[in-house]
Amino acid sequence: MKMSRLCLSIALLVLLGTLAASTPGCDTSNQAKAQRPDFCLEPPYTGPCKAKMIRYFYNAKAGFCETFVYGGCKAKSNNFRSAEDCMRTCGGAIGPRENL
């Protein structure tokens, strides 16, 4: 009786662990962070030129892509022409447009 109860408990734990690991929507943020390029952690860089171009950067602290004003030259890698490029490269979503 005790042995069958122990076996049943172990089987249930294994089943629950398997279900939890294979559940869609399970937190994969650590995997995304591991695959994110290092330049996604850099702050936005306007550059020395005076143009006023709207670009996107990945805000690592907030966890999403935001806009910033780019001067037009000497861009760094965390500088994207579209929100889609930013999200594809660094992950996250499109954030508020407060920086315009």
From Swiss-Prot:
Residues 1-21 form the signal peptide. Residues 40-90 form the BPTI/Kunitz inhibitor domain. It is found in: Secreted. Disulfide bonds join C40-C90, C49-C73, C65-C86. Gene3D superfamilies: Pancreatic trypsin inhibitor Kunitz domain. The keyword Secreted applies. The record marks K50, A51 as: Reactive bond. The keyword Secreted applies. SMART domains: KU. Pfam families: Kunitz_BPTI (PF00014). Residues 22-33, 100 form a propeptide. One of its GO terms (molecular function) is serine-type endopeptidase inhibitor activity. Keywords: Disulfide bond, Protease inhibitor, Secreted, Serine protease inhibitor, Signal. GO terms for cellular component: extracellular space. It comes from the Eukaryota. This is Spleen trypsin inhibitor I. It comes from Bos taurus.
